[in-house]
């Protein structure tokens, strides 16, 4: 693990590429352990890295030594994410790229739905928006380039494919992913103690709630 300071109160801990589920599991377990450590204010997970925010004026050298020791003693088996099922309505006005994705892969919309809803995905990280899950585990034969021209508005709840990943937009925003459906499930609720439905390390299964072709 490489540990580099990025400010007076933050360091980035990164692993060598490429990102993998094994390395992400290590980072998830490490982040959970760090949350109970003294002087650590926040831990933000990324892809193949995490950022540790500390109280101001924490000495860098002792901090790095402590992080290295904790990393060496890490027990990944202690980490267990949750499993969440998310209902999806595929196609229709809210999944308007489904036909284009099917054409790109020279198959039918029904087959795309089947391939997308069969796997169990893993939340690699939360980013872009509060609660936006970057999901690993998309079958290689569903990898699809992003749209050449991003949309100025993607409705909240939209389910899309972007390259080798799939995800869900918690809020309305611009976006360039291929939209294949939508969910009514809220991914963010500021009134909850844990406002994001999904967290890094959770697993997700899409359930076909409906099909609009």
Curated annotation (Swiss-Prot):
The keyword Hydrolase applies. Keywords: ATP-binding, Hydrolase, Nucleotide-binding. It holds the Pfam family CT_C_D. Its EC number is 3.5.2.9. GO terms for molecular function: 5-oxoprolinase (ATP-hydrolyzing) activity; ATP binding. InterPro entries: CT_C_D, Cyclophilin-like_dom_sf, PxpB. It comes from the Bacteria. SUPFAM superfamilies: Cyclophilin-like (SSF50891), PH0987 N-terminal domain-like (SSF160467). It catalyses: 5-oxo-L-proline + ATP + 2 H2O = L-glutamate + ADP + phosphate + H(+). The keyword Nucleotide-binding applies. Forms a complex composed of PxpA, PxpB and PxpC. This is 5-oxoprolinase subunit B. It comes from Haemophilus influenzae (strain ATCC 51907 / DSM 11121 / KW20 / Rd).
């Amino acid at each position: 693990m490489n540990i580099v300071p990025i400010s007076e109160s933050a360091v980035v801990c990164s692993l060598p590429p490429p990102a993998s589920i094994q390395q992400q599991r290590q980072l998830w377990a490490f982040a959970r352990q760090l949350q109970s450590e003294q002087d650590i204010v926040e831990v933000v997970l990324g892809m193949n890295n995490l950022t540790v925010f500390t109280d101001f004026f924490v000495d860098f050298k002792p901090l790095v030594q402590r992080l290295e020791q904790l990393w060496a003693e890490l027990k990944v088996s202690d980490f267990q994410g949750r499993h969440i099922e998310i209902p999806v309505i595929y196609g229709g006005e809210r999944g308007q790229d489904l036909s284009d994705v099917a054409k790109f892969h020279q198959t039918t919309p029904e087959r795309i739905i089947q391939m997308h809803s069969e796997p169990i995905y893993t939340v690699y990280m939360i980013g872009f928006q509060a609660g936006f899950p970057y999901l690993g585990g998309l079958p290689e034969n569903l990898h699809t380039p992003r749209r050449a021209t991003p949309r100025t508005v993607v409705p909240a709840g939209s389910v899309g494919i972007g390259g080798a990943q799939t995800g869900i937009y918690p809020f309305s925003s611009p976006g360039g992913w291929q939209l294949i459906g939508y969910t009514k499930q809220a991914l963010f609720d500021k009134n909850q103690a844990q406002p994001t439905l999904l967290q890094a390390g959770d697993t997700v299964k899409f359930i076909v709630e409906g099909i609009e072709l």
